[in-house]
């Protein structure tokens, strides 16, 4: 059985294009214990939060898969929510990777209510965005 599972994982990784959401769903069916979040945070959240069909808001959603703390809730517990990502090219990947039928996707930066500028300039470096025009 382990050999069949390993072979299936190998086939998925080598023959299915890197459309993360499709590939991740297939891998998740074979390896349901796969962590998407950093250091298994998504798995711990799924264990603590027992509710089915809940609602989430993820600020800094990235591509919707990489270090996602909500994808596991969506795939295995039927959750839906709002995913917010400020970086345009990363947001484009988010739209491909996460279901718009289940979630609302928004390209926006989140700032405090007392932020007095018209826009936020952001520097993007891998998984971290840093605002540049905040005093």
Residue ranges of model-derived segments:
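Phosphate/nucleotide-binding beta-alpha loop and adjacent structural elements of enzyme active sites
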Residues: 1-135
